């Protein structure tokens, strides 16, 4: 058993993204959330996947959000449904919330981690690693992992990019939710 496997008898939440690149469906990414290691961070992400957190009866979350930053051999970043450009922040706890912990390390591809602009600035933005990124340990909270659909992550990683590592084709979360 690795350090990121769940305790015996514990079932972690599984969420998904259906991805489109341009106007073409690209596949599904299924992610396991570490609610036993990072409960607050995992719950924020889960609710933004399901849209169950609402403001004035309007679901808040990742449906129709984009991946706005792609760096091959590093990560794909998305989730800014506020502004769409990497400057927006929102969480179910308010605009931002604190770093929960740094127990899980950025040891390889397929790890789900919070994007931030410094200590205790977590919101809606996240990234999925496509390679080891140990230099992020202690700065970004890993709260889940891809359990199916790493090929879809690789498709995102290979979209041509322009200025600011922005994909030249729109990479969109067409649908999302909890399994």
Curated annotation (Swiss-Prot):
GO MF entries: cyclosporin A binding; peptidyl-prolyl cis-trans isomerase activity
Subcellular location per the Swiss-Prot or TrEMBL entry: Nucleus
Annotated keywords: Isomerase, Nucleus, Rotamase
KW Metal-binding (keyword) present: no
Statement: the UniProt record of this protein carries the keyword Isomerase: yes
Domain PPIase cyclophilin-type span(s) in chain numbering: 16-178
Catalytic activity, reaction form: [protein]-peptidylproline (omega=180) = [protein]-peptidylproline (omega=0)
Pfam families the record matches: Pro_isomerase
Disulphides: none
Any GO BP: protein folding
One GO term describing the cellular component: cytoplasm
Record-linked PROSITE patterns: CSA_PPIASE_1, CSA_PPIASE_2
EC class name: isomerase
Gene3D superfamilies per UniProt: Cyclophilin-like
EC number, UniProt record: 5.2.1.8
Similarity field: Belongs to the cyclophilin-type PPIase family. PPIase H subfamily.
Protein role: PPIases accelerate the folding of proteins. It catalyzes the cis-trans isomerization of proline imidic peptide bonds in oligopeptides.
Protein name: Peptidyl-prolyl cis-trans isomerase H
Name of the gene this protein is made from: CYP3
């Amino acid at each position: 058993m690795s350090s990121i496997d769940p305790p015996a008898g514990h079932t972690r939440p599984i969420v998904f993204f259906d991805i489109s690149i341009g106007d073409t469906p690209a596949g599904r990414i299924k992610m396991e959330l570490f609610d036993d290691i990072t409960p607050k961070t995992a719950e924020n992400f889960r609710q933004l996947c399901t849209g169950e957190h609402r403001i004035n009866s309007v679901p808040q979350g990742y449906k129709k959000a984009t991946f706005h930053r792609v760096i091959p051999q590093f990560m794909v970043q998305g989730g800014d449904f506020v502004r769409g450009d990497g400057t927006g922040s929102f969480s179910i706890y308010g605009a931002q919330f604190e770093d929960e912990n740094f127990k899980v390390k950025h040891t390889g591809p397929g790890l789900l981690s919070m994007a931030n602009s410094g200590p205790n600035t977590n919101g809606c933005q996240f990234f999925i690693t496509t390679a080891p990124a140990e230099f992020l340990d202690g700065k970004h909270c890993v709260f889940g992992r891809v359990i199916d659909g790493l090929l879809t992550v690789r498709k995102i990683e290979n979209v041509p990019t322009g200025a600011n590592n922005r994909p030249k084709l729109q990479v969109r979360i067409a649908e999302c939710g909890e399994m």
